[in-house]
């Protein structure tokens, strides 16, 4: 009998494309996803990336989708450059 994998949260193509776009930036070494939490409330996301925080390895970002909030980490040695690029591209506020 075929076994089905239980997915706690669906992985949407929209935020996968966003992560691929971040990973394609020349200053980004790696992009890793963290926790996926259900989105509370009925409000729509203002920007795909709502929070950009500096951490030791680069940047910690929060991605808003229709049904979930995803924490991700952008490993880079030029976090200011990557954060400015995200704002210029309209990905972050």
PLM regions: where:
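Short, Lys/Arg-rich flexible segments
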Residues: 1-93
